[in-house]
Amino acid sequence: MRIMIVTDAWFPQTNGVVSTLAQTAAWLGRFGHEVRLITPQDFKSVGCPTYPEIRLSLLPYAKVKSSIIEFAPQALHIATEGPLGLAARRICLRHGMRFTTSYHTQFPQYLRARFPMPLSVSYRALRWFHGAAARCMVSTASVRRDLAAHGFQNLSTWHRGVDTGLFKPHPKEFLSLPRPIAAYVGRVAVEKNIDAFLKM
């Protein structure tokens, strides 16, 4: 199958979205699918204000359209709501192409932490973006419940796999440590709300 993934989040960013998409593309290729990615690396871009690692592609519509038409994907997935995602969404709707999207991060909370933007405005924009998709894939049941409570209707849970060649059980050397044991695994960023974890 020819599968196209459109994402505004890509290397050199280091985050779960990039890791998920890179692993997904690699595994789809191993299963015999032909995967094509549209990423900011293919476009002139500028750094996002307050987060320069995020590259915002400039005027991507024509190039995204030609890439989609040339590749003629049998499945098209729009992973992000940025300039590339918006261009791909518009192209799909204009040409009657079905597509899926994914919701990877607590974007409304992220915006509220960095800018004085009400959550209702962010959720309305996200409902508009993802509502046109055949399915909007989310990472967990709790995210699915949260989005459903905010009026999202076309949700599916996209479970993440574990690479057992990389992550495997170790000897139970920590069993004798005093309880409770808590650990945070992830990036240090304002949207991760690590303060709440540290106050446990």
Regions found by a protein language model. Give the residues of each.
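Glycine-rich, highly charged phosphate/nucleotide-binding loops
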Residues: 50-67
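Conserved donor-binding loops in enzymes that form glycosidic bonds
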Residues: 8-10, 160, 184-189
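Nucleotide-sugar donor phosphate/pyrophosphate-binding loop at the beta->alpha transition
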Residues: 98-100, 107-128, 138, 164
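Conserved donor-binding/catalytic core segment of Leloir-type glycosyltransferases
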Residues: 171-198
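N-terminal subdomain of nucleotide-sugar transferases
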Residues: 1-44
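Active-site proximal beta-strand in glycosyltransferases
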Residues: 3, 75, 90-110, 137, ...
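Donor nucleotide-sugar binding/catalytic pocket of nucleotide-sugar-dependent glycosyltransferases
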Residues: 123-170, 176-177, 184
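Short N-terminal targeting/anchoring amphipathic segment
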Residues: 64-85, 95-100
